[in-house]
Amino acid sequence: LTRVQATPGSVQGYLDPSAHWHDLGTVAEYQQVKAEIEKPVRGAIATVDAAKLFGYALTAGEAPIKGGSGRRFHRVAKPDGSTAMLCIYDDARPENLGYGRIGHALFAAGINVPQVLAEDTDAGVLVLEDLGDTDLCTLSQQPTFPWPAVASALEQLGHLHRLGAEAVQTAGVPLMEPFGDKLYTWERQYFTDNVLAGRKLDRDLQNEMATLAKELSGRPQVLVHRDFQSQNILVRQDQAWLIDFQGARLGCQFYDYASLVFDPYLTCKDMDLWRIEIEDHAREVADWKGSLDEFSHLLHIAATQRLLQACGAYAFLGRKQGRADFLAHLPQGLRNLTIAASLCGKRRIARMAEELAGATAVSR
């Protein structure tokens, strides 16, 4: 005001053309807005800096470990030689932010998952117990089928189904949307969009696909892993440890069992016979009180639904994101879909999958 009085016109103004004006008002409001602006972009931190946050350094000469879904993994070590797994995640998938909290809850419940050692959610940095690199998929390619590890994986899955929901609820951990008609429909559409390239299905085939959700939605809900396949099961001394459970949600237990029984990554000799063994042990682990036929039917219904989703993922990642390693599994996924759909009487789905498997094999 003194300046204006001394030299009229010396203080200029600015006319804001925006539709509205927000006055920050208080110092507290200003500090809150400033903090939001200065907040780090989740997952943008350099790997070396992420390791330093918790006193670790990258392991010399070791390449990054395969990741995906907006995550990257590295083995890190402390000066005393102890190692851990460093996970840097971004906001590509909303479930990435929940991995640490779900992991804490499941570990506290006694389920075999990596212990969460540290986390900075703002930076998108998670430090996990190092359980090694051996997964069930790798073991299945050896001459002897890794039955002890498979049995252990099913038993840990049983613990997850019995204890998981209460564990995350007690810990106040929010979960992704539960399985229901909406999610089952999305999985089917994912298959149509990516495997069939959006080709319109005839009404009878659409109706047959829709019956899968009706049968699964009527079952009791437990906490399901949602991606219970051999690459997401680490093995140490024949004991299984579950990883990549960030998509866990309430759903039908058969979805998880079917994910392993008909896992397209499991292509070892005599896999058809091993599927019977895996199904039998799954029934024991589930403490199933119904008939053998009902369990088998629901397992194959769930496998058909699951494989629609899995094949959709292989096609999407392979054709739209250039991941030839995923596209290579599409023919086996379609062959497994043919078997599962046939065994639960979904003949139209089985016929479609068989035709697609043949066409995919020829195109390769």
Residue spans of the language-model regions?
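A short, conserved alpha-helix in the catalytic core of glycosyltransferases
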Residues: 1-8
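All-alpha amphipathic helical-bundle segments outside canonical DNA-binding/catalytic cores
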Residues: 176-179, 291-302
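ATP/Mg2+ or Mg2+-diphosphate-binding catalytic cores
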Residues: 312-364
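Active-site acidic catalytic loop and adjacent metal/ATP-binding pocket
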Residues: 70-77, 86, 160, 210-257
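ATP-binding pocket architecture of kinase catalytic cores
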Residues: 65, 74-186, 190, 196-197, ...
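Conserved NTP-binding catalytic cores of kinases and kinase-like/nucleotidyltransferase enzymes
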Residues: 12-16, 20-125, 222, 236-241, ...
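Active-site activation/catalytic loop segments of kinase-like enzymes and analogous catalytic loops
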Residues: 189-198, 253-289, 303-321, 333-340
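Hydrophobic packing residues in well-ordered alpha-helices of helical domains and bundles
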Residues: 99, 146-153, 184, 202-209, ...
